[in-house]
């Protein structure tokens, strides 16, 4: 018997990228399960979670993928990005080196992901105001220069987590609605079926994921 979470109009794959320790896993768990784990260790391999939201009267199911940021996981790059229509590029506002590495992550994203992918720059751990190492204005200017949307979040106290995911999913939905992307060869992810209007009956799960 299908659960309520299986009923949706669109399925969007969104990836979380950025250095290890910036809070990607906690952003994922805060948005999908409203949980935060102070003791969370670096993610090993890949995991994903889902959550459905309403965008302009349509049910959009987000399939959010998370992986560790360490170099040794580069081998999974192409599979990780395949079919992704959105990316949250995350850095830690209290660790400038994680912001410096945004450039490298952005290059990797543009090398491996679809050219039309929607990208949001996310300054996480905004609750660490007293330790801030990356000025908001600096990151905002960088985002504008690279045509990224931008937001600061705190997975710990929930600030802007909902807004970050809702904003990027809405932006993806509008791209679909405006025919910038679609479900055929012109679509994000090279027609992998990641963006799909749901038929009347629940689609097979395999249709929704990486082929």
UniProtKB/Swiss-Prot annotation:
<dbReference type="GO" id="GO:0009792">
    <property type="term" value="P:embryo development ending in birth or egg hatching"/>
</dbReference>
<keyword id="KW-0547">Nucleotide-binding</keyword>
<dbReference type="GO" id="GO:0030133">
    <property type="term" value="C:transport vesicle"/>
</dbReference>
<keyword id="KW-0333">Golgi apparatus</keyword>
<keyword id="KW-0963">Cytoplasm</keyword>
<dbReference type="GO" id="GO:0055037">
    <property type="term" value="C:recycling endosome"/>
</dbReference>
<dbReference type="InterPro" id="IPR005225">
    <property type="entry name" value="Small_GTP-bd"/>
</dbReference>
<keyword id="KW-0342">GTP-binding</keyword>
<feature type="short sequence motif" description="Effector region">
    <location>
        <begin position="40"/>
        <end position="48"/>
    </location>
</feature>
<comment type="function">
    <text>The small GTPases Rab are key regulators of intracellular membrane trafficking, from the formation of transport vesicles to their fusion with membranes. Rabs cycle between an inactive GDP-bound form and an active GTP-bound form that is able to recruit to membranes different set of downstream effectors directly responsible for vesicle formation, movement, tethering and fusion. Involved in regulating the meiotic maturation of oocytes. Plays a role in egg shell formation, regulating exocytosis of chondroitin proteoglycans following fertilization.</text>
</comment>
<feature type="binding site">
    <location>
        <begin position="18"/>
        <end position="26"/>
    </location>
    <ligand>
        <name>GTP</name>
    </ligand>
</feature>
<dbReference type="GO" id="GO:0006887">
    <property type="term" value="P:exocytosis"/>
</dbReference>
<dbReference type="GO" id="GO:0016324">
    <property type="term" value="C:apical plasma membrane"/>
</dbReference>
<protein>
    <recommendedName>
        <fullName>Ras-related protein rab-11.1</fullName>
    </recommendedName>
</protein>
<dbReference type="GO" id="GO:0000281">
    <property type="term" value="P:mitotic cytokinesis"/>
</dbReference>
<dbReference type="GO" id="GO:0006898">
    <property type="term" value="P:receptor-mediated endocytosis"/>
</dbReference>
<dbReference type="GO" id="GO:0061796">
    <property type="term" value="P:membrane addition at site of mitotic cytokinesis"/>
</dbReference>
<feature type="lipid moiety-binding region" description="S-geranylgeranyl cysteine">
    <location>
        <position position="209"/>
    </location>
</feature>
<dbReference type="Pfam" id="PF00071">
    <property type="entry name" value="Ras"/>
</dbReference>
<keyword id="KW-0653">Protein transport</keyword>
<dbReference type="GO" id="GO:1990676">
    <property type="term" value="C:Golgi trans cisterna membrane"/>
</dbReference>
<feature type="binding site">
    <location>
        <begin position="124"/>
        <end position="127"/>
    </location>
    <ligand>
        <name>GTP</name>
    </ligand>
</feature>
<comment type="subunit">
    <text>Interacts with rei-1 and rei-2. The GDP-form preferentially binds to rei-1 and rei-2.</text>
</comment>
<dbReference type="GO" id="GO:0015031">
    <property type="term" value="P:protein transport"/>
</dbReference>
<keyword id="KW-0967">Endosome</keyword>
<feature type="lipid moiety-binding region" description="S-geranylgeranyl cysteine">
    <location>
        <position position="208"/>
    </location>
</feature>
<dbReference type="GO" id="GO:0060473">
    <property type="term" value="C:cortical granule"/>
</dbReference>
<dbReference type="GO" id="GO:0005819">
    <property type="term" value="C:spindle"/>
</dbReference>
<dbReference type="InterPro" id="IPR050209">
    <property type="entry name" value="Rab_GTPases_membrane_traffic"/>
</dbReference>
<dbReference type="GO" id="GO:0005813">
    <property type="term" value="C:centrosome"/>
</dbReference>
<feature type="region of interest" description="Disordered">
    <location>
        <begin position="187"/>
        <end position="211"/>
    </location>
</feature>
<keyword id="KW-0968">Cytoplasmic vesicle</keyword>
<dbReference type="GO" id="GO:0000139">
    <property type="term" value="C:Golgi membrane"/>
</dbReference>
<dbReference type="GO" id="GO:0005525">
    <property type="term" value="F:GTP binding"/>
</dbReference>
<dbReference type="GO" id="GO:0030703">
    <property type="term" value="P:eggshell formation"/>
</dbReference>
<keyword id="KW-0636">Prenylation</keyword>
<dbReference type="GO" id="GO:0005829">
    <property type="term" value="C:cytosol"/>
</dbReference>
<keyword id="KW-0206">Cytoskeleton</keyword>
<dbReference type="InterPro" id="IPR001806">
    <property type="entry name" value="Small_GTPase"/>
</dbReference>
<dbReference type="InterPro" id="IPR027417">
    <property type="entry name" value="P-loop_NTPase"/>
</dbReference>
<comment type="similarity">
    <text>Belongs to the small GTPase superfamily. Rab family.</text>
</comment>
<dbReference type="GO" id="GO:0055038">
    <property type="term" value="C:recycling endosome membrane"/>
</dbReference>
């Amino acid at each position: 018997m299908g659960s309520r979470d299986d009923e949706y109009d669109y399925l969007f794959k969104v990836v979380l990228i950025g250095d290890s320790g910036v809070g990607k896993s906690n952003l994922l768990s805060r948005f999908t399960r409203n949980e935060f784990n102070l003791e969370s260790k670096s993610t090993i391999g890949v995991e994903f979670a889902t959550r459905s939201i309403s965008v302009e009267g349509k049910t959009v199911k987000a399939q959010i993928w998370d992986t560790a940021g360490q170099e040794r996981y580069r081998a999974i790059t192409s599979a990780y990005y395949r079919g992704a229509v959105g990316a949250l590029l995350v850095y830690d506002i209290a660790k400038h080196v994680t912001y410096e590495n945004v450039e490298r992550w952005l290059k990797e994203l543009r090398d491996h992901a679809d050219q039309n992918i929607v990208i949001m720059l996310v300054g996480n751990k905004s609750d660490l105001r007293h330790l801030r190492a990356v000025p908001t204005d600096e990151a905002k200017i960088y985002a504008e220069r690279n045509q990224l949307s931008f937001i600061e979040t705190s997975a710990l106290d929930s600030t802007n987590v909902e807004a970050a995911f809702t904003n990027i999913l809405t932006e993806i939905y509008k791209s679909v609605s405006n025919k910038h992307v679609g479900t055929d060869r012109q679509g994000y992810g090279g027609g992998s079926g990641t963006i799909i209007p749901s038929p009347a009956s629940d689609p097979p799960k395999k249709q929704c994921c990486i082929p």
